[in-house]
Amino acid sequence: NGKVYSINLGRVIYSGIYYNKQLFEQNKIAVPTTWPELVAACETFKAQNVPCMTAGGKDGWPIFVGAYGLIGAMYPDQAALVEGLWNGTIKWNDEKSLEMWTKMQVYARDMMEEGASGIAGDAAPGRFASGAVAMFPGGSWYAPAIEAAQPTFDWGYIPFPGSDTAADNQYWFGKYDQGWAIASNTPNKDAAVLYLKEFSDPANYQAFVDAVGFIPTQPTAKLNTKIGADIAPFLGNFRVGYEQYWIAPKGAGQFANPWASYFKPFGTDDDPKVLADKVQADLQAGLDAVK
């Protein structure tokens, strides 16, 4: 009803790519800002027998979450994407979406290192921190694990360059994460309010976001972390991501999602057009059911 009902503790970004600064410098590769530059970088690394990307493919979700930035680059207005899918002005098998699927196949099939499907999600940060892989697409929450695995490892974090146009690749996509709320009928209201007051003390909140790696939502806080320095230039372009808006229509099929993990070797699909038609058909089944 227009009132505050919880205190949000921070934001997370899931649309970026961690990159190994030393490998980029050694191979004289510029940090990519467009999709063609990303493709060229991966081809150069592979020619030098350096795996381009890694991710926790064994767990499934890190593969499609790793490509959320690609979806954002193609559809920067994520709320409009969801609205368009519901009203039919955007389809997962239209020309623009087919470009997205084609790029997703390149990402899953050609950019991911061989064997990524056997890497657990919690092992991927350590694999990247070992220095053996050039890039690691994933969320901002991985940064503390990377630093813990190898404190001296020199890495950076960039928006996923999924568009052919650099200006479209300057957004962060993510979500507002954990929050505290106080039940209206709690017998401990005074204690709960006092806890939130202490938690919101600038020094306490700063220590919290530094420790957990959240992007702060309290105006008093600063981006003190290593990843914060890379996030800051584009933080004004932070947008809530697709999956926070999306509510699938009841009756939609199991493939009604924009997931890169459908492609081999993580899934069974190997034709972008066939997959696009399948995804749209599964979505359409749900849309037709709720008309």
Label each PLM-derived region with a short phrase.
Residues 1-33, 39, 57-84, 175-181, ...:
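Periplasmic solute-binding protein
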Residues 26-27, 109-110, 148-212:
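Extracytoplasmic/periplasmic substrate-recognition and gating elements
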Residues 57, 74-99, 148-150, 162-171, ...:
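Short, solvent-exposed loop/beta-turn-alpha elements that line the ligand-binding surface or hinge
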Residues 25, 239-291:
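Conserved C-terminal helix/tail region of periplasmic/extracytoplasmic solute-binding proteins
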Residues 48-52, 130-138, 151-153:
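Alpha-to-beta junction loops
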Residues 43-44, 86-117:
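Glycine-centered hinge/linker elements that transmit conformational signals in sensory
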Residues 121, 138-143, 159-160, 176-178:
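Beta->alpha turn/N-cap motifs
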Residues 33-40, 115-129:
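Short helix-initiation/N-cap motifs at beta->coil->alpha
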